[in-house]
């Protein structure tokens, strides 16, 4: 499910957990305060750091090599108010670019790239994104030049042939994704959430070997500061102390 929709559902109390791109929070915070009386930065807390999600800018146009060349081009940015669309807005503003934005989902956008109806598409997701793995050599990634403003928001990253067989190494940016919950002290909910967190930590090796490749580079053991959900932070700290003392936690 889309990260922007996720945080909206969390704020409305319709879900207990939400996977969120951190750059999305700035966009939705004011709207959620107005529509749901939900203060994202005070009432939403990080349960678990996940991994970096790369910004993919993909084209079949051989003349589009740098992001600056997207000026006035027709570019799919994902469904309206989606995480990809919001990240695309930040990205394009950072480069002071104007494009003809099309709000197509990734699979629709790929079809239109093949037919020539679109010049490029922007999508944010942890590489490798399954929809992009089997593209042919007529596709390539558009390079993102260094940008001091964007580097305050995103992390510099490279995607290339080691991830996608059709892609040469290309500079891009990535955004951290996290699992968030509402600040609350319901004992049953806290216990359930802690059990889930423990299950993830205990099965990290299985996730590394059989899950998405991003699990191998995840940040799930990193402890969040004031933005962290206290019951989750407690679990992470206990794991760190025990493993630091030479103990290995196993499920009975």
Region annotations inferred by a language model:
Residues 33, 87, 97-186:
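Pocket-lining segment of extracytoplasmic ligand-binding domains
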Residues 53-111, 115:
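Bilobed "Venus flytrap"/periplasmic-binding protein-like clamshell domains
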Residues 1-68, 76-79:
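Short, glycine-/small- and polar/acidic-enriched structural segments
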Residues 80-91, 155-225:
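Ligand-binding clefts/hinges and TM-proximal coupling segments of bilobed small-molecule sensing domains
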Residues 1-4, 19, 61, 78-86, ...:
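Soluble non-cytosolic domains of exported or imported proteins
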Residues 108-117, 121, 125-136, 141, ...:
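An extracytoplasmic/periplasmic, membrane-proximal ligand-sensing/linker region
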Residues 14, 19-22, 26-29, 61, ...:
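Sec/Tat-exported extracytoplasmic proteins
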Residues 10, 36-37, 41-42, 59-60, ...:
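Mature, folded catalytic cores of secreted/periplasmic enzymes
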């Amino acid at each position: 499910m889309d990260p922007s929709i996720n945080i909206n559902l969390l704020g409305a109390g319709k879900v207990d957990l939400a996977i969120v791109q951190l750059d999305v929070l700035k966009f939705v915070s004011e709207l959620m305060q107005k529509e749901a009386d939900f203060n994202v930065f005070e009432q939403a807390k990080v349960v678990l750091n996940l991994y970096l999600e790369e910004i993919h800018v993909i084209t079949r146009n051989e003349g589009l090599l740098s992001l600056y060349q997207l000026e006035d081009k027709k570019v799919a940015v994902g469904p309206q108010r989606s995480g990809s669309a919001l990240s695309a807005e930040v990205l394009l503003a950072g480069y002071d670019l104007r494009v003809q934005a099309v709000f197509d989902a990734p699979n629709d956008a790929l079809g239109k790239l093949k037919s020539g109806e679109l010049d490029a598409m922007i999508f944010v997701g942890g590489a490798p994104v399954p929809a992009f793995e089997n593209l042919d050599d007529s596709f390539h990634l558009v390079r993102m030049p260094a940008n001091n403003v964007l580097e305050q928001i995103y992390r510099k990253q490279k995607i290339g042939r080691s991830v996608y067989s059709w892609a040469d190494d290309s500079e891009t940016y990535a955004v951290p994704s996290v699992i968030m919950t509402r600040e609350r002290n319901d004992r049953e909910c806290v216990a359930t959430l802690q059990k889930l967190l423990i299950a993830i930590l205990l099965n990290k090796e299985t996730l590394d070997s059989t899950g998405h490749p991003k699990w191998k580079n995840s940040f799930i053991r990193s402890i969040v500061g004031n933005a962290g959900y206290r019951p989750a932070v407690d679990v992470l700290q206990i794991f760190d102390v025990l493993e630091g003392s030479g103990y290995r936690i196993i499920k009975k």
